[in-house]
Amino acid sequence: MEGRQYYPPRENVEGNRTTMGGGPHSPWHSPVPYLFGGLAAMLGLIAFALLILACSYWRLSGYLDGEENQSRERDLEVGDVKPDKTAVKPVALPEKFLVIMAGNVKPTYLATPSVKTCTCDDDDDEDDDVEGSDQVVPRSSESNGETH
């Protein structure tokens, strides 16, 4: 190295009274360990959440309890299990719909759907049925299968 001179770092500058560090350099002064540490923490949290979801799914399906062959919902397509003769069939209840009417004091109503057959000649009879009814009646022609 011709022409260049090497000056070693000075321990103490007399005018400033500051010392130039000769101590060990810490890797925590860089943002890289924090970046990878945060990334590892997030991936660990995601893995933990997926583990919780998998365990709760297995518990609800009866896999961990050994009830996979004793469940009530048997696969009848396989053919090895006969349908249960003593099973109680559910009672068919009428369907109810929640209709929200905007602008009223109490805007919530329960309605029973009804199919109304409409003819084009009988317009007066249609208005009489709708006035005294609390039921929701579809007005479109597609809902009852007729075309005009």
Swiss-Prot record:
Expressed in the vascular tissues. Also detected in anthers. Probable subunit of an amino acid transporter involved in the regulation of the amino acid metabolism. Stimulates amino acid export by activating nonselective amino acid facilitators. Acts upstream genes involved in the salicylic acid (SA) pathway and in the geminivirus-host interaction. Residues 1-24, 120-148 are annotated as: Disordered. Belongs to the GLUTAMINE DUMPER 1 (TC 9.B.60) family. Residues 1-34 are extracellular. It comes from Arabidopsis thaliana (Mouse-ear cress). It is found in: Membrane. This is Protein GLUTAMINE DUMPER 3. The keyword Transmembrane applies. One of its GO terms (biological process) is amino acid transport. Residues 120-132 have a biased composition (Acidic residues). Signal peptide: none annotated. Overexpression of GLUTAMINE DUMPER 3 leads to free amino acid levels accumulation, plant size decrease and to an enhanced resistance to geminivirus infection.
